[in-house]
Amino acid sequence: VAIVQLGNTGAARSITHLTLIAGFASTVFWPLTTALHAELSWREVYFVFATLNLCLCLPIHLWLRRRPRPAASTGAVSEPAAPASDERPVGEARRSMAFLWMMGGFAAAGFVLSAVLLHMVPLLTALGLGTAGVLVSTLFGPSQVASRLINMMFGGRLPQTILAVIATTLLAAGLTLLLTGAPNVAAIAIFVVLFGLGSGLISIVGGTLPLEVFGRVGYGARVGWMSAARQFTSAFAPFLLAVMMAGLSVGLSLAVLLAMALVGVLAFAVIVWLQRLSTPAVPTKDPSPA
């Protein structure tokens, strides 16, 4: 939100870079936390991290707050500006529909990701992979970072609506492979890679898709709604999957997750359609002589 409010013309690309860097947070801080906890109590570890936030993050945030923002971000009245290069807004008549479909897409993706990631190892064990499931599941993190890196290098001209469809399609493809290929280790490894790729892209489009479809005005509020929809379904998805795995078969539980992933694909595909309906047709020249 801060990147967009600062008025940078390449906000979508900046969000991609920031997401890529943030992907290394667990890689750096999980081992660091373990090392600190070997020497300090858990309260002292939290104190160290709180001090880092106060001494490092807070000054940066205060500095960003003092930077001038464009009139659209400050609420000043001005002439409507032309959309930036990273914006392809839908028409006013279709905005409400696009907003609801986008919330549905992020809610479905959040449900699938939260359910699978929390139960990754138990799920793979239940499918007959055994202790190898722990090793295979480690492919998720590198795949997630790889998707962000690939998108940063080669996805600059790809519309974020298409990227959202690709992300949810990767989730659905991974679940399909898991449902049909288990307990084959190679099939499950490909599932983990596909799931990591989809998760990495979802984390990017969570910030860039509302910007492209709706523009900068009201961006913060819209991102908040999208995040709320995703967090809401993410909160109860692991519990619901555990209940389904206990009361139903693992296969039926995966089928439900696959259906939810396909709902996400459909939701973002509808937004692509709405966006194309809002794109003005390019007029053709009359070939007849004047």
Regions found by a protein language model. Name each.
Residues L18-R69:
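Helix-loop-helix hairpin linking two adjacent transmembrane segments in secondary transporters
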Residues R94-A146, N151-M153:
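Extracytoplasmic gate region of multi-pass secondary transporters
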Residues A35-T51, V243-A261:
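A membrane-interface helix-boundary motif in multi-pass transporters
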Residues F106, S137-S143, R157-L209:
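C-terminal transmembrane helical hairpin of 12-TM major facilitator-type secondary transporters
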